[in-house]
Swiss-Prot record:
Gene3D superfamilies according to UniProt: MetI-like
GO process annotations (BP): protein transport
UniProt keyword annotation of Transport present: yes
Family: Belongs to the binding-protein-dependent transport system permease family. OppBC subfamily.
GO cellular component entries: plasma membrane
Taxonomic lineage from the root: Bacteria, Pseudomonadati, Pseudomonadota, Gammaproteobacteria, Pseudomonadales
Subcellular location: Cell inner membrane
Protein name per Swiss-Prot or TrEMBL: Di/tripeptide transport system permease protein DppC
Gene transcribed to yield this protein: dppC
Protein role: Part of the ABC transporter DppABCDF involved in the uptake of various di/tripeptides. Is also involved in the uptake of phaseolotoxin, a toxic tripeptide inhibiting the enzyme ornithine carbamoyltransferase. Responsible for the translocation of the substrate across the membrane.
ABC transmembrane type-1 domain sequence ranges: 99-288
Bilayer topology term: Multi-pass membrane protein
């Protein structure tokens, strides 16, 4: 009799997966997101271990091998897999070391814009009649300007360089986090659990950071992923315009700028950095789509 009562409890069909396992199953179901994750893991590995992965120092010049084509083309050298640039520097080594800066800029700008964006969004959501309108009008003004133009203006004021590039991209990304956080907060404030917390005597800070904010993180995680790809793209654009990281530091946008005069007779010095930017941004966007599908209950149920 006891065995009959205990049988349903041991039925595997009644055992629910953990939230992490359920998230991974939903994310891995999206083949594009999984491919993007694998590509980004490769980029991160190369960036972290660049001194050991790269065949040469990114600034080392081989004067006898200027604009050498990739190894599979006529005139290529096996020692230079992706060829060399106009100064005889190994292109593969510069791309690998350039990944470090691109990932650093993307991660730093996301963190710098995410934290104040969440705080301002919470303040705007909890103060809809006072601070909220002022914050949102300021965000509307920032959104009215093209993001790249605003970033160029900020860097032009602060001066070119790595830190100023990160600051400019972070400022440009700020309105998206503020608006998204405020919208999520306004939705959550009408939930029963928030009302129950108020009646239980929870203060404003507890409501903000303990009750409401954890339930707003799913869209913010997706937005942070998409902003990461936008930051890499903006950093490359600023570097191409000469306002980002300055030569001879290897950075994908700067590599494009220095090689644009050789596009007709040495296509690889322009195409390969551009292709690296394209694939990295595409991989991160695919990851963002997978995260959105895995974290959004509506999309998960629809699937």
């Amino acid at each position: 009799m006891n065995a009959m009562h205990n049988a349903p409890a041991s039925d595997p069909s009644l055992v629910y997966p953990s939230p992490l396992k359920e998230f991974w199953q939903s994310f891995a179901h999206n083949k594009g997101a999984l491919g993007g994750l694998l590509f980004m893991l490769l980029i991160v590995f190369c960036a972290l271990f660049a001194p050991w992965v790269a065949p040469y120092d990114p600034s080392e010049q081989f004067r006898d091998f200027l604009l050498t084509p990739p190894s599979w083309l006529e005139g290529g050298q096996a020692r230079f897999l992706l060829g060399t640039d106009e100064l005889g520097r190994d292109l593969l080594s510069r791309l690998i070391h350039g990944a470090r800066l691109s990932l650093l800029i993307g991660l730093s700008s996301v963190v710098i814009s995410l934290i104040p964006g969440i705080l301002l969004g919470l303040l705007a959501g909890f103060s809809p009649n006072r601070a909220g309108p002022l914050i949102m009008r300021l965000m509307d003004i920032m959104l009215a300007l093209p993001s790249l133009l605003l970033a160029v203006a900020i860097v032009a004021i602060l001066g070119p360089g790595l830190i100023n590039t990160v600051i400019a991209i972070a400022i440009v990304s700020l309105p998206a986090y503020v608006r998204l956080t405020r919208a999520a907060v306004m939705t959550e404030l009408n939930r029963d659990y928030v009302t129950a917390s108020r009646l239980a005597g929870a203060g404003t800070l507890r409501l903000m950071f303990v009750c409401v904010l954890p339930n707003c993180m799913a869209p913010l995680i997706v937005q942070a992923t998409l902003s990461f790809s936008s930051a890499i793209l903006d950093a490359a654009a600023l570097g191409f315009l000469g306002l980002g990281v300055q030569p001879p530091t290897p950075e994908w946008g700067t590599m494009l700028a220095s090689a644009r005069d050789y596009i007709e007779r040495a296509w690889w010095v322009v195409s390969l950095p551009g292709l690296t930017i394209l694939l990295s941004v595409l991989a991160i966007n695919l990851m963002g789509d997978g995260l959105r599908d895995a974290l959004d209950p509506k999309l998960k149920n629809a699937a």
